[in-house]
Amino acid sequence: MNKKDFIEINKNGWNTLIINNKPFSNTILPEYGPFLKRNENEMNIMNNINGAKVLDLGCGEGESLEYLFNKGAKEIWGLDISKEQIKKAKIRFPQFKDNFLVSPMEEEVNIPNNYFDYIISIFSIGYTSDLNSTFKYSYKYLANGGKFIISWTHPFYYCLDIADDKVVINKSYFNEESEIITKGPDKVNLVQNNMMISTVLNTASDNGFYLDKLYEEETILKDDVNGYKSTFWRKEKTVNCPSTIIFVFKKH
């Protein structure tokens, strides 16, 4: 799928989800992913958040940024492909309304360079049409010593399915082709990528980052994600496989 179509499907899809105002599975801080035993309150990955400047890639309505602001972040910025989500983020943060921009994360925007203490991508990195560009621009925006924190579905979890009440492997871990998925009760189309761990690590390294931490957290057995029951997120699959992988990259 070409980049233009990829972006257009996701832009329209997220706008539709917000306009329809129906529940869908969503991950926001302090949670890093579905079913995890620990969240940011226990993990303390952003241990220097007080007074920090934070940029959220795929910020949605600003819920994760609200958590960080309440924890002491001084300045918050957000990018999102959905104008409907950005509208809600600006309402949530009228004092920072000029800091919320409608844009794909993989395109350069007019925000300060060498500026942010933290850049976060909480369950949004798989919706980029260009992983390399996302890392490239994130490196430009981040201050020296700053951290880029990414959480996303564990790539092996993508390979699992349930058939005849058994967990089976039905996809290749090596398949990184983009695919159409549906989200929410109305089954709205979105496009996402499954990325091997090595792909993420190598792309980050190619753009100047080094890996500071990698987390594969244990899960708890639940039937819903923040109250929403999903056919993809199933407790049976998390018994022996992490639902989420968390990368913490650092800029030299």
List each model region and its residues:
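Short alpha-helix
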Residues: V191-L214
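Class I SAM-dependent methyltransferase SAM/SAH-binding core
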Residues: L55-L57, E61-E108
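Conserved class I S-adenosyl-L-methionine
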Residues: M1-N50, E63-Y67, F148-E179
